[in-house]
């Protein structure tokens, strides 16, 4: 009975997400990623800034209503994102309806079309269900294993709540960019493959991998260095010890951001190559190891809750490495480690050094946390340009995809 408010609060999100996915797919098919990217940012920001106040007010009633407040915030964020997509779709639909039809094209019959859709969608759907299914298993596994590790149940509930409610919520914000990058790769690579344009396919794949590290590395290191400051800015902690443990969890968990970003990009590339089963299998293997490690590590008294981020790091590493191998195999491209990895890593290291020095020199406080975040963004952007991690040639395709969509041209 205590979970009923949560189920009622999250139930509308099921319908909202399905409708929004169809609209996102329409826009992505036109290689216009702006609506998808903005709607995802609306989702993630809404989950943080709407869910938290609702959880606060719900806590005045009971813990169950606090959890329901978080879930209701998710439904509200999905609803606002869907409303945005509907507005954009209505604006764009007239332009696409006005395009002349190709008289040589024969529309597919319902059965072949349905068969083709299912062959593409079933592996993608199963792949998308893997991580939520593992999270569902973890929700019961983590708490029980913390108790098995000798932690009092009340303390275990606090640890689990801070990890799942605080740490994972913050980690999900930058991963929205990873999903946007992945989704932008699918239509462009599929189009190049359909034309037999191997050069463009390899260039887009290389760009996607480069952007994964350009975006993922600074997010991982920046959040890791500023974990305590970011948590203090957004959340309230009853004791310094609670803040310390949560900051350590966030610092370790933030390293999964870059791994998740690369997994998403390589999955997008493979899906564009019509190899959508491969990322499903690699992620399934990673999640299986994650569940096993969670059970083993969290039950150890000396590791306990810290086993959860360690298991996540292992999960995405296991998924990432074979994905990279298959991308190289099926695209035929050579992995330019200097351009794809080393230059972004150098820019990130320089940013990290500046941030570490600034943390020592600047006073603590919410205002100074915002200053540190701004400093990290600005210094990384400067170092990325100076080291060549990001160039004008890299930005041009990104701006074309994210900056303006275009209707498909009629082929003669």
Mark where each language-model region is.
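Membrane-proximal transmembrane or re-entrant/amphipathic helices at the cytosolic face
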Residues: 356-412
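Interfacial segments at transmembrane-helix termini and the short loops linking adjacent helices
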Residues: 1-10, 224-257
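Membrane-interface helix-loop junctions in multi-pass transport and translocation proteins
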Residues: 30, 34, 45-83, 87-88, ...
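Helix-terminus/linker motif at the lipid-water interface of multi-pass membrane proteins
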Residues: 57-59, 125, 129-174, 191, ...
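Hydrophobic transmembrane helix module of multi-pass membrane transport proteins
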Residues: 1-133
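Membrane-interface junctions at transmembrane-helix termini in multi-pass inner-membrane proteins
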Residues: 16-39, 255-285
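Helix-loop junctions and terminal segments of transmembrane helices
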Residues: 175-198, 267
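Interfacial transmembrane-helix starts/ends
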Residues: 114, 118, 164, 197-214, ...
């Amino acid at each position: 009975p205590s979970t009923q408010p949560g189920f009622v609060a999250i139930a509308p999100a099921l319908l909202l997400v399905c409708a929004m996915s169809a609209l996102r797919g329409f826009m992505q098919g036109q290689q216009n990623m702006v609506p998808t990217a903005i709607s995802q940012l609306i989702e993630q920001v809404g989950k943080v800034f709407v869910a938290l106040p609702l959880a606060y007010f719900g806590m005045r009633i009971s813990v169950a209503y606090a959890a329901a407040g978080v879930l209701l915030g998710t439904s509200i964020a999905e609803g606002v994102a869907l409303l945005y997509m509907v507005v954009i779709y209505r604006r764009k639909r007239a332009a696409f309806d006005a395009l002349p039809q190709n008289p040589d094209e024969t529309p597919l019959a319902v059965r072949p079309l349905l068969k083709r859709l299912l062959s593409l969608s079933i592996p993608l759907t199963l792949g998308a269900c893997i991580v939520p299914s593992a999270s569902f298993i973890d929700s019961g596994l983590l708490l029980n294993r913390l108790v098995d590790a000798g932690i009092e149940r009340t303390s275990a509930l606090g640890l689990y709540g801070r990890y799942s409610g605080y740490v994972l919520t913050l980690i999900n914000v930058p991963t929205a960019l990873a999903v946007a990058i992945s989704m932008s790769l699918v239509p462009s690579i599929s189009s190049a493959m359909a034309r037999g344009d191997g050069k463009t396919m390899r260039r887009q794949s290389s760009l996607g991998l480069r952007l994964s590290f350009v975006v993922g590395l600074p997010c991982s290191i920046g959040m890791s260095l500023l974990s305590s400051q970011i948590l203090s800015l957004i959340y309230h902690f009853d004791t310094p010890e609670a803040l310390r443990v949560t900051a350590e969890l966030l610092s370790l968990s933030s390293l999964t951001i870059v791994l998740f970003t690369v997994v998403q990009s390589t999955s997008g590339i493979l899906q564009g190559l019509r190899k959508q089963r491969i990322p499903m299998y690699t992620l399934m293997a990673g999640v299986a190891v994650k569940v096993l490690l969670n059970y083993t590590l969290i039950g150890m008294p000396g590791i306990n809750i810290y086993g959860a981020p360690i298991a996540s790091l292992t999960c995405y590493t296991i998924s990432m490495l074979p994905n990279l191998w298959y991308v190289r195999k099926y695209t035929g491209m050579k992995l330019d480690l200097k351009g794809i990895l080393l230059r972004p890593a150098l820019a990130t290291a320089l940013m990290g050094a500046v941030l570490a020095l600034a943390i020592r020199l600047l006073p603590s406080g919410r205002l100074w946390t915002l200053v540190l975040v701004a400093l990290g963004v600005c210094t990384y952007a400067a170092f990325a340009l100076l080291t060549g991690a990001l160039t004008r040639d890299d930005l041009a395709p990104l701006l074309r995809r994210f900056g303006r969509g275009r209707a498909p041209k009629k082929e003669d």
